[in-house]
Regions:
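GST-like fold's C-terminal all-alpha helical module
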Residues: 91-195, 241
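Acidic/histidine-enriched, glycine/proline-rich intrinsically disordered or flexible terminal extensions
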Residues: 204-241
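Alpha-helix initiation and N-capping motif
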Residues: 85, 181-184, 225
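Short, solvent-exposed turn/loop segments enriched in Gly/Ser/Thr/Pro and often Arg
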Residues: 26, 152, 204-205
Length: 241
């Protein structure tokens, strides 16, 4: 989601060179272990990017690296002032280090583990609430994560923590008391209202409201003609094989 949100934001800002193809990688079928994908990401994890705009294709893997690469390539969504840039990068890398505790830690033990282990749930819940408090305090006196400028810091944090703040993942909103983080709630809704963020969130989704799922994106027109709803109606989904 982070990468497609940034790509859609770049296109919306007039950077035509950010036009992209988003292929669906079926991790349930093991697509990520195929030689084609491993060539893009030797760690066999999504996302991965291959930039073919230059004389030699450039691979970039890990979402933080991709966001930074694109922001620098297009000179957008990353402050140029050294102090503001450092603040934005600090929050970008905060997300890289913090999100595993949310997804792989709390999310796993609270929602997916075959049986509940109270200590694990409580330990990771405490950490996630601490993280939400960090975000909430930071947003108390600034519009965006790094100040008054929307940046890749926001784009990196919003998909995970924004979804958590709105109670959209793990059915844990009440358990974590997410409604109490008022500043995160305000920030989440502000970004969710951005058309580019809405489009980016649709890309490569195959679960949820079919009208807001776009399994693959190869052209801007796909948002109107190739949603999951349209593919199912046309008998083109699920794909053969």
């Amino acid at each position: 989601v982070k990468v497609t949100v940034l790509l859609e934001e770049l296109l919306a800002a007039g950077h035509a060179g950010a036009e992209y193809d988003a292929w669906l990688i079926n991790i349930g079928s093991g697509d990520q272990f195929g030689s084609g994908f491993v060539g893009a990401n030797p760690n066999s994890k999504i996302p991965a990017l291959v930039d073919r705009s230059g004389p030699v294709p450039q691979r970039v893997f890990e979402s933080g690296a991709i966001l930074l690469y694109l922001a620098e390539k297009f000179g957008a969504f990353l402050p140029t002032d050294p102090a503001k840039r450092a603040e934005a990068l600090s929050w970008l890398f905060w997300q890289m280090g913090s999100a595993p505790y949310l997804g792989g830690g709390f999310g796993h033990f609270y929602a997916y583990a075959p049986f509940k282990i109270e200590y694990c749930v409580d330990r990771f819940a405490m950490e996630v609430k601490r993280q939400m408090d960090v975000l909430d305090r930071n947003l108390a006196d600034r519009e965006y994560m790094a100040g008054d400028e929307y940046s890749i810091a926001d784009i990196s944090i919003w998909p995970w923590y924004g979804a958590l703040a709105m109670g959209l993942i793990y059915e844990a909103g009440e358990f974590l008391d997410v409604a109490s983080y008022k500043n995160v709630q305000r920030w989440t809704k502000q970004i969710a209202a951005r058309p580019a963020a809405q489009r980016g969130r649709m890309v490569n989704r195959v679960m949820g409201d079919p009208a807001t799922c776009l399994p693959e994106r190869h052209d801007a027109g796909d948002f109107e003609t190739r949603t999951l709803e349209k593919l199912v109606a046309a008998g083109e989904w699920p794909k053969a094989g």
